[in-house]
Amino acid sequence: NITVGEEVDYYTEVTGGDLAEGEDIRSARFLGDIGYFVTFKQIDPLFSVDLSDPSNPKIIGELKIPGFSDYLHPYGDGKLLGIGLSVDEEVMTTEGVKLSMFDISDPANVKEMSTYVLENVLSTDAGYNYKAVFADAEKNLFGFMAYGDSIEYKMFTYDEAEGFKEVFSKDIVNYGNVRGLYI
């Protein structure tokens, strides 16, 4: 559930109602008065929630998509990058890591602009360690560790006309906390 709270004398007091009841929250991103939440149950919506009045949060948009993003990152004006999993909704099997670019220019009408599935990649660190993702919208680059048949660090660019493009991949043999850096 999504519950809005307010800090009062060193503790949090619930001020808003429950949203997305019965759903597991996979990722969240707050951009001003709007919060974006991806939940997971059977169908995996991306909610946009108006949080300008903490005592009365309102779902203003909902995009139902297959799979889910367990990492969300703003990617330039009006765009939100999602990294997660592509899931076959009928048999509930994972098809690979899914990249999504969302158009959030109108929070009430969020659209998935483009997707790309890395079919031989089963997981990333993005869902549990936000520092594991390198993302620079100005340079149009983002990267992360990818785990599947091998362990690789992958980097991508995004173009509205052509979608996602892998621009770098390096096998990692001895790894710890590998992160990308642009110099």
Task: Put a short name on every predicted segment.
Residues 1-183:
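Feature marking well-ordered beta-strand scaffolds used for ligand recognition
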